[in-house]
Amino acid sequence: VSMLAPQGDALVFTLSGLSKAAGLPQMKLGWIHVAGPAPLRDEALERLDWIADAYLPVGAPVQHAAARWLARAHDVRTAICSRVEASRAALDCRLNAGGATRVLPSEGGWSAIVQVPRVHSEEEWALQLLSRHGVLVQPGYFYDFSTEALLVVSLLAAPEDVASGADAVLDLLKTFSFDRRWSIL
């Protein structure tokens, strides 16, 4: 069943744009597919049209280039998927080796969640990685995770950079003195 197909008597809004479709987050062009019962759909489209005209103009350069970008979108998405898979493998190889860190399972996306020992706050982990190693991660609380200590790592970086960042986590772990009771397990 297509995600664009109407589901019963409800309106279904499917959002997309150049950011995800063509790997171009800096080029602001998005669209909404509206499905559902004709009267509700038509009213929603009228309102969306007004909002788009009033608040969401698309720049002429983006309009001019959009067709070419979309024609190349499949190749870009394929390259992004390959890079994300390779970066994930590099991260898994280093941080899932049975030590005090682990990469949590995921079902997709271009970020990984790394669980580290709760010897310091997520913020302290992030700050230490940045100041000591130049490695940028985000603390899990940015994403409203309810448990500590989680770090969110971008998988869009080159696999060798992700591997280097993982090595920095392990190096930093060596400098933290902690009792094994504080391990993540």
Predicted region positions:
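Conserved glycine-rich beta-strand-loop-beta hairpin in the small C-terminal domain of fold type I
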Residues: 67, 82-92, 102-116, 147
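Short hydrophobic/aromatic beta-strand micro-patches
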Residues: 33, 113-115, 154-156
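Conserved PLP phosphate-binding loop immediately N-terminal to the Schiff-base lysine helix
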Residues: 1-3
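Short, solvent-exposed loop/turn segments at secondary-structure junctions
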Residues: 19-21, 39, 108-111, 119, ...
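Surface-exposed helix-capping loop/turn segments at secondary-structure junctions
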Residues: 95-104, 177-181
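Conserved core segment of the aminotransferase class I/II
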Residues: 5-85, 173-174, 178
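A short linear hydrophobic-aromatic micro-motif
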Residues: 14, 99-103, 136-141
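PLP-dependent enzyme catalytic core of the Aspartate aminotransferase-like
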Residues: 128-137, 143-185
